[in-house]
């Protein structure tokens, strides 16, 4: 991921196609916002070329640029990895989604667990939600995650944080690991110790996030409010990232 943006710019200049220009501009804009510690106003546009788009662009630029087009498409598809390595974030929060969470779920206070560098916490705070960010900070020893938080992070394991900060309206967990059972332990702690009416997870069903057991349980809520929130949070890449709410009466 070294010189990621530089490689993008070079390939963009060589390919010289408006569809490619647009995606490179989108990536640069996201990088500008995140790099300056600011949340995006709305979810980013879709990145990467679908097979038919790839073929259409290739016809216009010539087959001699196929290698370059393949390379830049690979960079588009690896943008999330770039963000994780440079800024320690896997999920791109945005103000529109945060405002909908506040309004539709009637949230005034929130606790983010496994917060990493707390980009989601920062965004929730931006729309007026009093937010506490917590993380065990174990991975901060070996990665960028947590190295430069966007919001103050308290060193606390998830279940301990839920027990300590029990009087919040919302618990949020973004990109819980797809190994171990920390997500199940967090839900168990919520049931035992917390007064929070809402618990949401951000991730990919049966994919990049959460334990297999998490997805096998029949505890997901399906509400009009959640549908509206998710309509503002379409994924920007091939990962089907969405917001899931756990039923507190399962």
Roles of regions detected by a PLM:
Residues 1-92, 237-239:
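N-terminal accessory regions of S-adenosyl-L-methionine
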Residues 134-170:
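S-adenosyl-L-methionine
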Residues 117-129:
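Conserved SAM-binding loop of SAM-dependent methyltransferases across substrates and taxa
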Residues 108, 169-170, 197:
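Conserved acidic residues
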Residues 168-183:
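A short SAM/SAH-binding and catalytic strip from SAM-dependent methyltransferases
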Residues 106-116:
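Conserved class I S-adenosyl-L-methionine
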Residues 181-250:
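C-terminal substrate-binding/active-site "lid" region of AdoMet-derived donor-dependent transferases
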Residues 84-107:
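Conserved alpha-helix/loop element of class I SAM-dependent methyltransferases that forms part
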């Amino acid at each position: 991921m070294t010189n990621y943006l530089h490689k993008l710019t070079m390939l963009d200049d060589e390919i010289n196609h408006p569809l490619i220009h647009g995606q490179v501009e989108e990536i640069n804009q996201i990088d500008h916002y995140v790099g300056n510690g600011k949340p995006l106003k709305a979810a980013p546009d879709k990145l990467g070329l679908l097979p038919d788009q790839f073929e259409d662009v290739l016809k216009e630029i010539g087959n001699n640029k196929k290698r370059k087009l393949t390379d830049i498409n690979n960079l588009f598809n690896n943008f999330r990895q770039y963000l994780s390595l440079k800024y320690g974030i896997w999920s791109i929060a945005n103000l529109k989604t945060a405002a909908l969470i506040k309004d539709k779920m009637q949230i005034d206070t929130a606790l983010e667990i496994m917060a990493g560098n707390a980009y989601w916490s920062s965004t929730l705070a931006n729309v007026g939600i009093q937010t506490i960010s917590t993380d065990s900070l174990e991975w901060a020893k070996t990665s960028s995650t947590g190295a430069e938080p966007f919001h103050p992070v308290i060193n606390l394991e998830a279940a301990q944080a839920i027990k300590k900060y029990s009087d919040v309206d919302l618990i949020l967990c973004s990109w819980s690991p797809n190994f171990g059972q920390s997500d199940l332990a967090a839900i168990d702690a919520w049931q035992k110790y917390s007064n929070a009416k809402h618990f949401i997870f951000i991730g990919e069903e049966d994919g990049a996030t959460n334990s297999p057991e998490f997805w096998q349980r029949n505890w997901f809520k399906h509400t009009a409010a959640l549908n509206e929130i998710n309509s503002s949070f379409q994924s920007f890449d091939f990962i089907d990232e969405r917001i899931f709410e756990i039923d507190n009466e399962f």
